[in-house]
Amino acid sequence: MLPLLLLPLLWGGSLQEKPVYELQVQKSVTVQEGLCVLVPCSFSYPWRSWYSSPPLYVYWFRDGEIPYYAEVVATNNPDRRVKPETQGRFRLLGDVQKKNCSLSIGDARMEDTGSYFFRVERGRDVKYSYQQNKLNLEVTALIEKPDIHFLEPLESGRPTRLSCSLPGSCEAGPPLTFSWTGNALSPLDPETTRSSELTLTPRPEDHGTNLTCQMKRQGAQVTTERTVQLNVSYAPQTITIFRNGIALEILQNTSYLPVLEGQALRLLCDAPSNPPAHLSWFQGSPALNATPISNTGILELRRVRSAEEGGFTCRAQHPLGFLQIFLNLSVYSLPQLLGPSCSWEAEGLHCRCSFRARPAPSLCWRLEEKPLEGNSSQGSFKVNSSSAGPWANSSLILHGGLSSDLKVSCKAWNIYGSQSGSVLLLQGRSNLGTGVVPAALGGAGVMALLCICLCLIFFLIVKARRKQAAGRPEKMDDEDPIMGTITSGSRKKPWPDSPGDQASPPGDAPPLEEQKELHYASLSFSEMKSREPKDQEAPSTTEYSEIKTSK
């Protein structure tokens, strides 16, 4: 009796329900060729629970096709034929029992572009196509590029795994093929370059090179690739020192550099690495916590001194290690002459010559054009040479017969240059073995000739003044006419045991013995010229100048 009473109530509730067919799906979907796309979809249809429960089938069709005869693009009905071109690429992903009609489209092709509609069937009562809500699919050209993933930073000498993947791709459709190209790859194992994953052991020279991953779907003309530049971390492998843009030669982490004393020096230290190493210069060989003299790769010395000769070290510090190089700085100088000087001594003419240079120079004496080299002792000369540090000293003793005009020169040289000095001895001793007599006779002759010349000049001047006084009065200049007309030629500086100039003050007159040793290099007389009167009103007078000569 109770079921009969409830039956009208159930009928009343059923009569209030209205059959509803609804579909929620995107109206337009765009996908690149060869990629995948998921189209979310949900639907509803009128169904009463007291009906029988036949299976629920859903279908996706191309727009314009007749559902009863056309092949579907996707369905859950195993008895319906699916289009061969969409087989495996168009798939239903949702649970249709939960009214999920989501559609997965893989390996999209240009011919897939078009409109699609959804249909639901269940038993004899539910057969409905949702023509009002269609899906518009557009397939465009592939512009997506693969991604290259580095599982860890690239470090020189350490194996690193890489992977290549294409965003938006899926397993639907033919498989993807991969290929890797780049200078960092080993040509001995080509199989490793055909996988989506790659193990790479980079080298320092691989930094900055290109690595390319190319993807292609088998059986399709779809190809895409991406190229990346490798960023390889590596410690310094070599250090180069440049001077004026020219690299110095380095042997066994040591470089030798000669520098002229007083010259400016600028050195550049270069150590390629990634990231860049910290460069610094140290004096000598640096200890663990030594303080650098330069915190950059540049070392500047404004004026190189001999005290700076020695070692400098350039160090390149890097997180992966350090490297350093030793520079041996050698300060050199050209020969600098001190001398030569000559003097008469008991054993003969004694000449001395000194040179300073780095390295110490070699010395050579020349008598006229005849070289006198080394330490030797022969009949007419004796040479003695020595060196200490940058100094080289040599002495030359000449004895025996010497020519009247004697030229003695001293020359020094090292690998960087040479310098020489000479002494010209005029009217020297003709023969040291004959003693003082020849020298005295020669000196007396010179003094007699000088007195005659002075007397003749004095007579001519007195005669000229008398003629001027007779013609017109004039006042003579206070200057001594005789001293104004006599000039002495240049001569060499006297030797240490020789006297000073002949016109020395009376208080400094040299001893008689030294006066005997005096020799003139030359003596000349200039042409006499008449002097113009300075004061016309002065009375006519005659002036005499006293001439003093050493005896």
Curated annotation (Swiss-Prot):
Q: Which GO terms describe its cellular component?
A: ficolin-1-rich granule membrane; plasma membrane; secretory granule membrane; tertiary granule membrane
Where does the secretion signal sit in this chain?
A: 1-16
Report the SUPFAM superfamilies cross-referenced here. Immunoglobulin (SSF48726)
Please list the residue ranges annotated as the Ig-like V-type domain.
19-136
Cytoplasmic topological intervals:
463-551
One of the GO BP terms on file = cell adhesion
Q: Where is the composition biased (Basic and acidic residues)?
A: 528-537
| Tissue spec. comment | Expressed by monocytic/myeloid lineage cells. Found at high levels in peripheral blood leukocytes, spleen, bone marrow and at lower levels in lymph node, lung, appendix, placenta, pancreas and thymus. Expressed by monocytes and neutrophils but absent from leukemic cell lines representing early stages of myelomonocytic differentiation.
Q: Which family does it belong to?
A: Belongs to the immunoglobulin superfamily. SIGLEC (sialic acid binding Ig-like lectin) family.
Protein name in UniProt: Sialic acid-binding Ig-like lectin 5
Organism of provenance: Homo sapiens
Q: What gene codes for this chain?
A: SIGLEC5
